[in-house]
Amino acid sequence: MEFTIKTATPEKVRTGVLVVGLFADGILPPAAHAVDKASKGKLAQLVKRGDLDEKAGAAVMLHDLAGIAAERVLVVSLGKSAEFSDKAYRDALNSVAKALASGVAKVAAVAIADAELDGRTLAWRLQQATRQIADGAYRFDAPKAGAKDAKKERGARKITLLIGDKVSDELEAAVRRGQAVAEGMALAKDLGNLPGNVCTPAYLADTAEALGKQFKFDVEVLERADMEKLGMGSLLSVAKGSHIPPKFIVMHYKGGKSKAKPVVLVGKGITFDTGGISLKPGAEMDEMKYDMCGAASVLGTFKAIARMALPLNVVGIVPATENMPGGNATRPGDVVTSMSGQTIEILNTDAEGRLILCDALTYAERFKPACVIDIATLTGACVVALGKIPSGLLANDDDLAAELLKRGTESGDRAWQLPLWDEYQDLLKSNFADMANIGGRYGGTITAACFLARFTKAYKWAHLDIAGTAWVSGDAKGATGRPVPLLAEFLVGRAAAKAD
């Protein structure tokens, strides 16, 4: 999908479909006002007659509108003007994205970013529009026969974003950012949606190496023998049950100054999670292919920042393995030694994400990071606590947590902070090791993060639990690409702060 910005009067633009937004109470933003005037009040009539629902995102398609050069005009409700918010704007954009993805026209002009929104610049509105329209065009048909031919036939190919202001470098950069984030989300979705027999640890490693080759950044892939030499006994305890070899992937994006400390992203890469000997129930176990969505988000974020040529140093770490039962699998009650030297009693082999992450977090120390963020589909408890709207956030540094919360709000990929209090650490006590890998029935998201916190004392660290946000179930089953928007926005903000 190709995006361009153009300063133009919307009623004179020749295109397959022209998109304008208006408020349910009859207030018309500039583009809608111009179309209404040229069509002799047709848009105002829609509102007056109640033909357009008040809810943001409701839409009506008008064909061959007199006085308008476009073949069709898609009129999208922005909701009530007094209630116009980030959510209302995004709801409207989702409606636009669905319409354009349906194949209503191959060429479209979108004039919806002219609606003023408190605290949001035109650049922000254009970036959101680009990202959501591009993301809305995503389809995953890879395993289906005829998928390539079907993909060619669907959706708008060229989108012109119409504005009343002069096109500037800032606005063009905003559109490029939106495209880059959408590309990163698409990669994360593709990896998440692939079945476990395809998206193996080796597949993730190959994907990382292909990205490195495309964007010219370094990639290292450590094998089982390398992990053994490093003393990654915790990670390797998870890999024991599978005949598929684990991989430890390290990506080095060097966009900043040579001596600048990097941001380190660590993504959980369990390519299929049966639970191991602590076997999961069979129902919906197919969705455990999504247990590598943390890894997918790191790879997707790397694609986004590389596409943006972000002036920042970033290291990506992906510990990747399956968690399978087998004759050589780890047993409940086994004690292993992590790379940090701390010992762990494994009371539940289905609490394996923290076991691979802890060694990756110890490995991250060697980079002397500015901060470390790990991303993991870690606990079902997070879904119980927060549902499927925000990701869970826990951190050992309040400023880092606040920064992530802010970037989540800006990107629409929000998180909610949970406590990381010392009192929870007592729940991880073990009679036979330095710690247990589970903390009991209550506060599971917090105790999982408390476990990880024991391996992050050397740096500022935040943990994103994306168990509720990485994918959706039901008829629309599929990976969401989250939290690529949050991570990308965070890194853009970090790069901007260094430039100031």
Curated annotation (Swiss-Prot):
NCBIfam families: PRK00913.1-2 (NF002073), PRK00913.1-4 (NF002074), PRK00913.2-4 (NF002077)
GO process annotations (BP): proteolysis
The enzyme's E.C. designation: 3.4.11.1, 3.4.11.10
Family to which the UniProt record says this protein belongs: Belongs to the peptidase M17 family.
Gene3D superfamilies associated with the record: Leucine Aminopeptidase, subunit E, domain 1, Zn peptidases
Enzyme class: hydrolase
Location in or out of the cell: Cytoplasm
The protein's required cofactors: Mn(2+)
Keyword Hydrolase attributed: yes
Binding residues annotated for Mn(2+) 1, in chain numbering: 273, 350, 352
UniProt function note: Presumably involved in the processing and regular turnover of intracellular proteins. Catalyzes the removal of unsubstituted N-terminal amino acids from various peptides.
Cofactor note: Binds 2 manganese ions per subunit.
Main location: cytoplasm
Residues that coordinate or bind Mn(2+) 2: 268, 273, 291, 352
UniProt KW Chloroplast keyword: no
Active-site residues per Swiss-Prot or TrEMBL entry: 280, 354
Annotated gene: pepA
HAMAP family reported for this sequence: Cytosol_peptidase_M17
Pfam families given in the database record: Peptidase_M17, Peptidase_M17_N
Protein name: Probable cytosol aminopeptidase
GO-annotated molecular function: manganese ion binding; metalloaminopeptidase activity
Assigned GO CC terms: cytoplasm
Entry keywords, A to Z: Aminopeptidase, Cytoplasm, Hydrolase, Manganese, Metal-binding, Protease
